[in-house]
């Protein structure tokens, strides 16, 4: 405590970010302040050189303060820089008492550029600087389905570079385009089609009606497979905005954020209103063993969403709850980011309060559906047995695969919300010559990506204690808090025992080794995770090997033998690099005379 007391007596009056650590140097919390001295001292009460938590703080904060043994600060120029740095560090380091919102993606917009002679609908996530661009969105899902439907229903120019070709293509022959490239339609006639396209984007009911008519025609002509494609597309477009029945008399452009939480679970709902209609919505489920802070959740949600410059900003941002201090901070952040004032408010009456109530009702409904399942009970039992500090709500599982140290690859699979999240899987080509260096490379590359993809609660490693220790060292050097377990086969005479029907799995934690019965649900849960990572890595290895065999066959056709292929691979690193190399470079490696 002497170090902490000394730090508290020498705090700067500058803007910056502060970090609290426990006695083991585990990161507890990251915060930011306009005045570090005032903010940090507000957590503590100091009497006779004895430090205690401020009794006015919440129980959650008091519990955290009791664990603080060290603090560090990072000074920045102003409060805006501190706000952005705080958000970045929380995502990268995942402190124990901070809430981590993972949904920080920029949603797509549909746009049409009317400064061109023949405008077409396209998708963007960025602001386009040319004049005459009209945006629609954001779309949390279904933007591509809308786009595909527009191109199939209307004779639009099908590709951006079509006009440059000056020659009609197959789309003209199948009556999907009017061939403006050959002047078969005037600009004025095409503009009518473009305006019809605008109407369908703005009025999804009309778009859906046209799709239903097309589906019916296909079905009547016994083209059932094509009709099914339209049926699925209609379903996706209908899901984009479940609140489209809500039309307000005033043409509001609003973004709406509602947060609802209790115990160790919470839900954040986002709704986007344009022209008085809700055009899309999204939600995120959040878990935390240490309770929730609405201010912190709202702050992170707003920064995540508006940190990238968006093509279409609302007139106003509505929140269901937030302190005046945080509201002011976020207002300044938005104004600074977009160089204009966009109001943030917590509505107390009228239409806008009704919108917040609808968002809250949906958040509560999603929350109520989060019933405790058998899987949740197994997670709790696994956390208790393996002495994990955090509930393993999000898990990353790693495995490597190779054949005689060739075609070395690694795979990472992700498990969250009681399901494998295949969109988050990652594949890696590895250079290591043995399983230890391969695993080290795999885990290091993942840790280096924590700033872009926040770390999970738990890593599961397919390997023994050596691989577990490698993971712990990498995480220690990264500064991020992630817990680790490993699973390996039982060994006899220093070899993994894999006899049919007799292979036993052992689970390793930093402090223990567990040999559980095959019927143990906790073991089966870890095995399920390991088996999926193994399947993923093996499949990637096989596809890599097949691709390499094809490349070798092509080189053999050019008169290059296997020994020469190995030399070229050792030098250039990949078949793609060999293809790009000149004959002179390849001959130099093979020491051939030209």
Curated annotation (Swiss-Prot):
SUPFAM superfamilies per record: C-terminal UvrC-binding domain of UvrB, GIY-YIG endonuclease, RuvA domain 2-like
Domain GIY-YIG: 13-99
Cell compartment(s), UniProt: Cytoplasm
Entries under Pfam families matching the protein: GIY-YIG, UVR, UvrC_RNaseH, UvrC_RNaseH_dom
Keywords: Cytoplasm, DNA damage, DNA excision, DNA repair, Excision nuclease, SOS response
Domain of life: Bacteria
Functional note: The UvrABC repair system catalyzes the recognition and processing of DNA lesions. UvrC both incises the 5' and 3' sides of the lesion. The N-terminal half is responsible for the 3' incision and the C-terminal half is responsible for the 5' incision.
Protein name: UvrABC system protein C
Gene: uvrC
């Amino acid at each position: 405590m002497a170090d902490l007391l000394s730090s508290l007596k020498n705090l700067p009056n500058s803007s910056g970010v502060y970090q609290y650590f426990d006695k083991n140097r585990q990161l507890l919390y990251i915060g930011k302040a306009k005045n570090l001295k005032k903010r940090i001292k507000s957590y503590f009460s100091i009497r006779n050189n004895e430090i205690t938590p401020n009794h006015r703080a919440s129980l959650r904060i008091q519990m955290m303060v009791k664990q603080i043994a060290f603090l560090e600060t990072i000074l920045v120029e102003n409060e805006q820089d501190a706000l952005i740095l705080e958000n970045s560090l929380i995502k990268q380091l995942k402190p124990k008492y901070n809430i981590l919102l993972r949904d920080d993606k920029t949603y797509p917009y549909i746009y049409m550029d009317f400064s061109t002679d023949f405008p077409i609908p396209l998708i963007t996530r960025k602001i386009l600087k040319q004049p005459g661009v009209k945006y629609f969105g954001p779309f949390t899902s279904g933007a591509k389905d809308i786009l595909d439907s527009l191109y199939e229903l209307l004779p639009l120019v099908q590709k951006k570079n079509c006009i440059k070709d000056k020659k009609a293509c197959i789309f003209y022959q199948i009556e999907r385009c009017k061939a403006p490239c050959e002047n078969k339609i005037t600009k004025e006639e095409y503009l009518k089609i473009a305006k019809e396209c605008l109407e369908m984007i703005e009025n999804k009911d009309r778009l859906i009606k046209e799709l239903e008519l097309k589906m019916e025609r296909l079905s009547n002509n016994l083209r059932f497979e094509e009709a099914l494609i339209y049926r699925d597309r209609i379903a996706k477009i209908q899901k984009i905005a479940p609140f489209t029945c809500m039309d307000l008399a005033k043409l509001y452009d609003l973004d709406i954020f509602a947060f609802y939480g209790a115990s160790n679970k919470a839900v954040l709902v986002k709704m986007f209103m344009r022209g008085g209609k809700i055009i899309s919505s999204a939600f995120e489920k959040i878990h935390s063993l240490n309770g929730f802070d609405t201010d912190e959740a709202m702050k992170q949600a707003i920064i995540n969403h508006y940190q990238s410059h968006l093509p279409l900003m609302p007139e106003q941002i509505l929140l269901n709850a937030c302190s005046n201090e945080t509201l002011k901070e976020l207002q300044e952040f938005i104004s600074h980011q977009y160089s204009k004032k966009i109001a943030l408010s917590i509505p107390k009456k009228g239409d806008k309060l009704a919108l917040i109530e609808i968002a809250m009702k949906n958040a509560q409904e999603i929350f109520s559906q989060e019933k405790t399942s058998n899987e949740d009970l197994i997670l709790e039992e696994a956390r208790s047995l393996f002495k994990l500090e955090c509930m393993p709500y999000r898990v990353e599982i790693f495995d490597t695969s190779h054949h005689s140290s060739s075609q070395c690859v690694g795979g990472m699979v992700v498990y969250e919300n009681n399901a494998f999240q295949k969109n988050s899987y990652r594949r890696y080509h590895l250079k290591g010559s043995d399983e230890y260096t391969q695993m080290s490379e795999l885990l290091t590359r993942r840790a280096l990506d924590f700033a872009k993809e926040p770390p999970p609660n738990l890593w599961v490693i397919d390997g023994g204690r050596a691989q577990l220790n490698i993971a712990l060292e990498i995480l220690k050097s990264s500064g991020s808090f992630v817990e680790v377990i490993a699973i390996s086969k039982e060994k006899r005479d220093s070899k993994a025992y894999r006899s049919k029907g007799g292979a036993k799995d052992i689970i390793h934690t930093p402090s223990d080794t567990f040999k559980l019965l095959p019927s143990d649900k906790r073991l089966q849960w870890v095995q399920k995770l390991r088996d999926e990572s193994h399947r993923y890595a093996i499949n990637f290895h096989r596809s890599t090997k097949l691709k390499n065999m094809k490349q070798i066959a092509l080189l053999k056709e050019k008169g290059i033998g296997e020994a020469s292929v190995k030399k070229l691979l050792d030098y250039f690193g990949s078949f793609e690099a060999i293809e790009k190399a000149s004959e002179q470079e390849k001959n130099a490696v093979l020491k051939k005379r030209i």
